[in-house]
A protein has these predicted regions:
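A feature for loop-to-transmembrane-helix boundaries and adjacent hydrophobic helices
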Residues: 1-289
Length: 289
């Protein structure tokens, strides 16, 4: 990954006919919000687009989750409580996962400044699953039903959130000459890489549409959750192989995210197949009776 510290990055997609343009990482500069420096400290650079985009993803995912919960017969008050807890725990989980595996922070401010980047989706998923299971017990709602709602919501949030990586000039892939290559830098200093953030965003959009279309045909609680993990795991396993900022489990053999993705894909696909067989046997026995 290209570790760019500048607030403005020059981007291009020459193979698609899109010339060089500048992307500013800061949505609102600290100079315009000087009073907030008393809260966040002198090192605070302003409101970053990364944080804005992540927040948009969270809000849209929450709104979709609330609409889906209504269809599932879960009260608005209950699902709102669930969402608030899930969002907080997911963000904490995403940050903890990132800090544990990547580290490199010199101050408490840098450690908690999630608005500047540094969130790991697997940490968010783990935190979200744990919070949903706990809240299902508190609200007396089937855990797998909540996980179905959460899965269909989080994949939408992921699709949007990946664009935070775009403005932060991070999570890119190896250099390539493919027509859809993305240029980073200007003129002779530019390098052309796989836009892996875009690959994952598009993959998640397709996954969201798939889950949305299958939801009305859902046969049992947990089905959408397992489809989500299988779909995302498979896509992440492939896309991660193109990234240059991965955490290696075995150097130059397999990455941590690839292994997690592969495990999710294999286990959840097996569960889906076994449940389908079980459903068909039950239907056949019902017809015979």
């Amino acid at each position: 990954m290209l570790g760019l510290l500048a607030k403005i990055t020059t981007i291009s997609f020459p193979g698609l006919g899109i010339g060089e343009f500048e992307v500013n990482k800061i949505a609102v500069s600290a100079d315009k919000l000087a009073f907030l420096k008393k809260i966040f400290g002198e090192n605070w650079g302003g409101i970053a687009w990364y944080g804005v985009i992540i927040m948009i993803g969270i809000v849209l995912a929450a709104l979709y989750g609330m609409s889906r919960a209504k269809i599932e017969g879960i009260s608005s008050d209950d699902i709102l409580d669930v969402i608030l807890v899930a969002v907080i725990v997911s963000v904490i989980g995403a940050r903890v996962y990132y800090v544990v595996f990547y580290g490199g922070y010199d101050s408490l401010y840098d450690l908690v400044a999630v608005w500047n980047g540094g969130l790991a989706i697997y940490g968010a998923v783990i935190g979200g699953i744990i919070s949903l299971i706990i809240m299902s017990k508190i609200k007396k709602v089937p855990a797998l039903r909540l996980l179905d709602i959460g899965a269909s919501s989080i994949i939408l949030g992921q699709a949007i959130g990946r664009w935070g990586n775009f403005v932060n000039a991070e999570a890119y892939g190896y250099e390539t000459t493919l027509p859809w290559r993305m240029g980073i830098g200007s003129g002779a200093n530019a390098i052309f890489v796989h836009p892996t953030f875009l690959y994952e965003s598009l993959w998640n959009i397709v996954g969201f549409v798939l889950i949305w279309s299958l939801y009305k045909k859902k046969k049992y609680d947990g089905q959408m959750f397992f489809i989500y993990l299988a779909w995302y795991g498979f896509g992440r396993m492939l896309i991660e192989g193109l990234r240059t900022d991965s955490l290696w489990l075995v150097p130059y053999v397999i990455r941590v995210s690839q292994l997690i993705g592969a495990v999710c894909f294999v286990i959840c696909t097996a569960i889906l197949v076994l449940m389908e067989i079980k459903q068909r046997k039950a239907a056949k026995n019902g017809c015979n009776n």
